[in-house]
Amino acid sequence: MKPVLALSIPVLALALTACSAPEAPISFSEENTAAAYAVPALPSFDELPVLETLPDPLAFADGSGRALKLRDWERRRAEILAQLQFYEVGTKPATPKECVSARMENDTTLVVDVTVNGETLTIHSTLKRPEGEGPFPVIIGCGFGGPGSLPRPIFETRDIATVSFPFWEVMSHTQTRGNEPINKLYPELTEIGAYSAWPWGVSRLIDALEQLRDSRLDLRRIAITGCSFAGKMALWAGAMDERIALTIAQEPGGGGAAAWRVSETLGEVETVGRTNYAWFKESMRDFSEENVSRMPMDHHELCALVAPRALLVFGNPDYPWLADRAGYVSCVAARRVWAQYGIADRMGYSFQDKHMHCALPQEEWPELEAFVDRFLLGKDVPTEVTTAPMFEDTDLSQWINW
């Protein structure tokens, strides 16, 4: 008779722990882990099918199945990135790190030189580090320095370094096509929108931070934020660079978190036909009005590109132009990607009214603090944030059927 192996409860628990799947990373050492994947088929506008509901963010473009395991997400992520660049914002240039050099001009001014084909673009960033040895987490503020429009005390009291991203040194928010700083390096990229160029600039800024000696920075824990058009900027940058651990998109509206399809049903809000085309490819106009249903992707998938890293979206329904009902639908849909991988609490959204544009109300401070504490400081705190009481009457089944 064969002997029976008996495991004590502690030994069995240890064995099960050892066999369990590793926790999904909160950031990566590479800008784009999906860069090696082949570009999927990208049909012309006339060849695209009509889809009234939001596309399934997990479904592979070739119809071969769904990305049900986290290990499959990298491939699906590559497809969504390709679609967003091809149909909306244009190609984000792939610039080798060897083209980037960094130096501190003084205690707080970081100078970043990006040289391509003998031409140089320079970014001047303000870097403020807490006193002490560190290493300190980092938050990049798009456009307006520090932590963007977020409350400074939340970051100052937690010893978090702040880095500014002066977007105008890469591309103006009004863009003259072919005559922007980035075109010194890439004169052929006249069709790209700012939401391709600005994330490129953020990535070069991160390259520079990686080069600094004795920086006292913890570059495994980088956050990015911005509000309004800079909230869109932060979202696009966080979606496109996987070295960013936490993306905080404050009131990003249409072109940011809001799903284009839903926005088209909401009246006088930012839609494909009513947006700033300095930010997008001119050809995106083809998807205006009823043609929005031909888009092979939508912005719940832009949000989902941040997965498995952390994303927090703040909305402000008092400003109709932001199309926050569309933002809510998009966030609910995107969060299902994190949920599929057992990490739904890495994606949060909070829609609060009765406050000024880009002024985070006191009620939302604890939600922000929780995400900062967990994903920048590594604390074990709950981050289950799904607040949108004014949109509870939304018929989600109209948009989400997967």
Question: Where on the chain are the PLM-derived regions?
Answer:
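Bacterial N-terminal signal peptides that target proteins for export
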Residues: M1-I9
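C-terminal motif of bacterial Sec signal peptides marking the signal peptidase cleavage site
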Residues: L16-A18
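Bacterial signal peptide processing site
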Residues: S20-P22
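Alpha/beta-hydrolase-fold serine-hydrolase catalytic core, especially in secreted/extracellular enzymes
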Residues: P25-H124, R129-G134, A307-L311, N316-W402
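Loop/turn elements at helix/coil->beta-strand transitions in domains of secreted/extracellular proteins
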Residues: P135-I139, T157-T162, L219-R221, E242-L246, ...
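Cap/lid segment of the alpha/beta-hydrolase catalytic domain
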Residues: G141-R213, G253-V262
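Primarily recognizes the serine-hydrolase "nucleophile elbow" in alpha/beta-hydrolase
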Residues: L205-E268
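Mobile cap/lid helix-loop segments that gate and shape the active-site cleft of serine hydrolases
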Residues: E251-L302, A323-C331, A339-A344
